[in-house]
Amino acid sequence: MDKLKVCLVNDSFPPEIDGVANAVTNYAAIINGELGAATVVTPSNPEADDAAFLFPVCRYPSLDTTKLVGYRAGLPFSPEIQNTLEDDGFDIIHSHCPISSTLLARLLRERIDVPLVMTYHTKFDIDIANAIRSRILQEEAKRLLVQNIAACDEVWTVSRGAGENLRSLGYEGDYIVMPNGVDFPRGRVEDSLIEQVTADYDLPAALPLFLFVGRMMWYKGIRIILDALAELKAAGEDFRMVFVGGGGDREEIIAYCQDLGLTDKVFFCPAIHDRNQIRAWYCRADLFLFPSTFDTNGLVVREAAACGLASVLIAGSCAAEDVTDGVSGFLIEENSAAMAARLRQLCGQRETMKQVGCQAQQQLYISWEEAVGRAYQRYGAVIDNYRRGLYPEHERLSDDFIRAMATSMELWDHHRDRQQARLRELRREYRELKEEMIHSRQRIKESIAQHLDRFL
């Protein structure tokens, strides 16, 4: 296959760090270094330093929406960015976000007539619920999201669970599972680095060490972990637990841990950006605890597997895909009692944990080179299908945009009419209440006058 020029589009990119930004960075680095040529297109950021990358990064105008959605929102209808990209000779466009990035990608497709692939990474229904309070507007946002995704020539998801989530939003088209990779090599780091990284914590070698790495948010299942550890301690088991990461719920989580009386056994390490130091924690631990049903990919589970560390996961979760219970990981129901029971069973079986970790390393590990290589091969098939006219024709974004604006205006009119009707109702109730108060005051005056006449 000839070398391809790939346009990678995403809403987040360094200095903003998340799983999708990491995926796009790896796609660009591997394609540009080994396979073809890649350009990243992403919103502008005043703190960005793109000189550090060995591939082109093209920025377009943005708004600061970090407090609302965690990253800057791009303005995809910028004519300047379209003019800049139009002459770059791209063979394919690959969007990694179904909102503004895909809007920009659709406009670019109309100009340069190449196929558009979109990867669905995260559960956007949760993001929509967090960002929009109105149920009516939430449903309309989901409809527009699905419409935007369906307008792509091919849709990929990072896991089967991500595909099921996409279906739950109303998407009815086909999709291909294209998993992400891990930027760790398979194997352990040096013992000297492990000792250096973990030296500040009370971690006796004779005790099992449990580990969590990720954002410190309750929706990651952290309450299940802490409640299970409290049960474990009450049962007389001795152990150690380390949480590595930052996040909006970190202080609440630490306070809850203190309330449970676990501070002698549970330690909190801030977020670590040095990847080898994170590997050191994976290599030091006996078991990785990740009872999250939120994540669509469970990348940290594959990171742990790269280091030979087995995970305890919720059966049926995306993170547990391809994991065989007792062979390449340990599966439980989504509650603290199940977690506690499994940990009690394993506390005295450190060799079993090690053997299962070795199987996880062999069965679950996927390098980014392998993951991007698969995607790059699929690019060739997508381009061929597009040129042969095998994908359905999609309406122009301008048509969709006009309809979306009309629908949004109708929703706004409906919302405004409801608010105005409610305001009129409140005014009427206020007038009635005011009149009732006047009448009540008059009755009280008359009653007092009658009593005074009686006694005077």
Name each region found by the language model.
Residues M1-R59, E369, A404-L456:
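N-terminal subdomain of nucleotide-sugar transferases
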Residues T352-I366, E370, Q377:
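A short, well-ordered alpha-helix in the C-terminal region of glycosyltransferases
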Residues T293:
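Aromatic "clamp/platform" in nucleotide-sugar-dependent glycosyltransferases that forms part
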Residues I149, A271, R279-A285:
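Short alpha-helical donor nucleotide-sugar binding micro-motif in glycosyltransferases
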Residues D325-G326, F330-S336, Q345-R350:
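Conserved acidic donor-binding segment of nucleotide-sugar-dependent glycosyltransferases
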Residues A310-I314:
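Short hydrophobic beta-strand element within catalytic cores of glycosyltransferases
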Residues C58-P61, Q138, R143-L193:
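Donor nucleotide-sugar binding/catalytic pocket of nucleotide-sugar-dependent glycosyltransferases
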Residues I254-I272:
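Nucleotide-activated donor-binding/catalytic signature segment of Leloir-type glycosyltransferases, i.e.
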